[in-house]
Every structure is written in structure tokens, then in C-alpha cells.
Amino acid sequence: MTNIRKTHPLLKIINSSFVDLPAPSSLSSWWNFGSLLGICLGVQILTGLFLAMHYTSDTATAFNSVTHICRDVNYGWLLWYLHANGASMFFICLYLHVGRGLYYGSYMYSETWNIGILLLFAVMATAFMGYVLPWGQMSFWGATVITNLLSAIPYIGTDLVQWIWGGFSVDKATLTRFFAFHFLLPFIVTALVMVHLLFLHETGSNNPTGIPSDPDMIPFHPYYTIKDILGFLVMLTALATLVLFSPDLLGDPDNYIPANLLITPPHIKPEWYFLFAYAILRSIPNKLGGVLALVMSILILAIVPVLHMSKQRSMMFRPLSQCLFWLLVAVLFTLTWIGGQPVEHPYIIIGQTASVLYFLIILFLMPMTSLVENYLLKW
């Protein structure tokens, strides 16, 4: 008799995705981050659901409702800190996942890659709106500054900003709609994840060598299920350590002060995972130019497949490209650091230099280096 997992209409979909799925035998730990992102999404939806049961999206009570969750709700502090730090773990895994794709040439699966970029934008939007909900100082001023960027759009900018705000400033209407969208978006993200996996399973996984692995495949279960479980344990241990020992490490102290539209914080900045893009935004003195650079800093990923000039897919055997890749990583760390610093000398010039380098490496240096490597292959 045929196994039920191969005949049942629902189980056979799960079977072909997670059990009998043929996978390359050479996948390294860098291929763990997809499943880790799935766990992060699950943790965020669960903790968020329970937080939403106690949260009130009203400017008069939002801050107090968060305080109530932390002080009066059973294990409310744990839910709150798991959700806040879970977002940080989510972005750590996201950036490592994208970095893996860039290093090993996974962007050549263009459908999967483009859905991934959409996912990145959706998760960033979700995180931004979530940061506004506690209605602390940085929530309010962060929302004001970032939404105000849309006013740089010619002709419709001002109307668009007021439409998003629901008035002439960030107020009750803004908070209510941000809560509604923050609740809705993770489910849209979940749907996009399914599409992402659908396209991935059409082509099969890439592997570290970048060459087709059709002759050497192994079943996903038990090999990669066990490997993923180890990844879960490592990540959840890291998250638990962060939450239980240093829960405010990645947060901003200003957000423990209730929002006050009469007092501007000395330095308005977003959460750490947006600082690289924020630094690029600030490095351009023109408002519209800054907004375009901000959007392009992420959207540039969409043209990476077009810029692939190498005869080899992966960077595994391309030492010159490897050097450039790690230079790009160093530039991103520099931008993240600069984004958290005040706008003064020498941070301004460092930020501008790093921003130019970021675009220069991706748009020119990497394709040119690939052509040089192609030439060296002839020797």
C-alpha cells in the first residue's frame, strides 16, 4: 500500500516540499537561513498575536498599554521582548540569507530572487510600522521623519503624506492604521513566502559550487531536517540569551519616554537594522536625491542578475570577487555605524564615502572584476 503522505492531497504537497524533496548533497550552513526565517516569522506572528490582545492603538493609551503588558500580563514582558528582539533576529537572518544569495549566485533564479526582494520590502515595512506602535519618543519622531520623506515626491508628495497620516501630523489616525497594517502584513509575508518556495522548488536549490547538482541529490528528510533543527536550536538559544540577559541591548532608551510632539530627541534614528539605509539617505544633501538613494539601496538587488558577468555562478572559486564581496560587507557595517552617529564632522564625510563605495562596488567593480576573472580563466 502506498504511503499516505504520497497520496493524501494535502500531505503530498508537504511531502514534496519537506520530505522527499531532492536537495544537493553539498549544502553548507549558509542554506539554513531560509528555515530560520520561517521560524522567526512563526515566532513573530505568535508573540504579536498575544501582544495584540492587550495592546490599544490609541495615542492616549498606547504607551500605557505596553507598560501594562510588561508589568501586569502573565509573562507579558517575555512576549514583548521576544517580539522586539525577534525582529532583530529576523533581520540578522534576512541579511545573511541575502548575502548568501549574492555570494553563491542564487540570484540567477530570477523569479525566486525577485519575490525575495518583495519579501524584504514587506518585512521592512512591517518592522517600521511595528516600531511606531509603543508610541515612545523615537516611535513618534521616527514615524514623522520617515513618512515625511514621501513629501519629496514631486507634485503629489504633500497630499500623499497627509493621506498616510490621516491628518496634518502623525496622530491617532496614523497610529490606528499602522497597527492595522502591522497586523495584516505578516500574513501577506507568509503568502509571499509560499510563492518564494513555489518558485524555488521549480528550479531546485543552488549549491556552494554553483554548478548543476542533478547527478548528486539526497532527500531533504532526514539529512536537512536534522540540520535545520540544529539551526533552530542555535538561533533560539541566541534569541533566549538576548531576551533574558540583555533585552534592551538593541533598543533605543528614548523609546521608554512617552511620545511628546513638543520635544524633539537630540538624534532621531530608526532601529539598528535600518541604519545602513538611513546613512545612505542622510549622505545626500538633497531631499529627493536622498529618498531615491534610500530606495535604490535595496532595489539595486533587482539588477544584480543583469550585472552578473562571470562565467562561474558562485564566488567560491573567484578570489578577486570574494575580496570585493567582503569589502561590501565592511562598507555595510560602516554605514550601519554611521547611521547611529550625529550629523557632524567626520561622520558626514565617512557616510558619503561609504555610500559612494556601496553603489560603486555593486554597479561597477563587481562586474568589471568578473570580466577580469573570465580573462584569467583563459590562461
Curated annotation (Swiss-Prot):
Residues engaged in binding heme b b562: 83, 182
Keywords attached to this entry: Electron transport, Heme, Iron, Membrane, Metal-binding, Mitochondrion, Mitochondrion inner membrane, Respiratory chain, Transmembrane, Transmembrane helix, Transport, Ubiquinone
GO molecular function: metal ion binding; ubiquinol-cytochrome-c reductase activity
Cofactor(s) listed in the protein's UniProt record: heme b
Subcellular location: Mitochondrion inner membrane
Protein's membrane topology: Multi-pass membrane protein
GO BP terms in the entry: mitochondrial electron transport, ubiquinol to cytochrome c
Main function: Component of the ubiquinol-cytochrome c reductase complex (complex III or cytochrome b-c1 complex) that is part of the mitochondrial respiratory chain. The b-c1 complex mediates electron transfer from ubiquinol to cytochrome c. Contributes to the generation of a proton gradient across the mitochondrial membrane that is then used for ATP synthesis.
Recorded family membership: Belongs to the cytochrome b family.
UniProt-listed PANTHER family: CYTOCHROME B
Name of the featured protein: Cytochrome b
UniProt organism field: Artibeus fimbriatus (Fringed fruit-eating bat)
Top-level taxonomy: Eukaryota, Metazoa, Chordata, Craniata, Vertebrata
